[in-house]
């Protein structure tokens, strides 16, 4: 069969035929430090880092190369804590946390327009892309525990602040 459409349409079909590479690159790092300053003071600090890049991960069957995407994820976070035992019956715990995450999804075809042909294929930029999200998270937690005989009382608070900027 011969395609009789405009040259640009025929070129789109040719560019979206065949086998396309799928590459992924992921790096992760974590570090935790624990310190017992005294019998009543214990500290910890943990840092996590992940960087991940994927290309053409959704190219398959009817999804053409021009519709496929490239994703970039960066996730970085720190959490620290302090436990203070004022007495065997009275313990105070404090935790602080910070996290930054970006999740970027970019199309291979940045200009569009979206072209969907049922039963044949999906081409060009998805209507909802690119998607660029940045999330930030801050958390403070405080807990005071008191034990007496068979009873245990726990008081505390948790403050969580989150922000999400999506384009």
Q: Where is each model-derived feature located?
A:
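Short acidic-glycine motifs
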Residues: 1-167
């Amino acid at each position: 069969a011969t395609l009789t459409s405009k040259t640009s349409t025929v070129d789109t079909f040719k560019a979206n035929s065949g086998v396309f590479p799928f590459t992924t690159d992921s790096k992760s790092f974590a570090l935790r430090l624990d310190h017992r300053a005294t019998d009543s003071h214990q500290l910890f600090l943990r840092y996590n880092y992940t960087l991940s890049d994927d290309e053409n991960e959704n190219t398959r069957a009817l999804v053409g190369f021009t519709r496929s995407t490239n994703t970039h994820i960066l996730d970085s976070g720190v959490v620290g804590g302090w436990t203070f035992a004022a007495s065997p019956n009275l313990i105070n715990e404090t935790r602080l946390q910070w996290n930054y995450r970006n999740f970027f999804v970019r199309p291979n075809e940045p200009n569009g327009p979206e072209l969907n042909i049922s039963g044949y294929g999906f081409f060009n930029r998805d209507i909802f892309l690119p998607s660029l999200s940045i999330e930030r998270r801050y958390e403070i937690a405080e807990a005071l525990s008191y034990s007496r005989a068979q009873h245990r009382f726990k008081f505390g608070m948790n403050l969580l602040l989150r922000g999400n900027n999506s384009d």
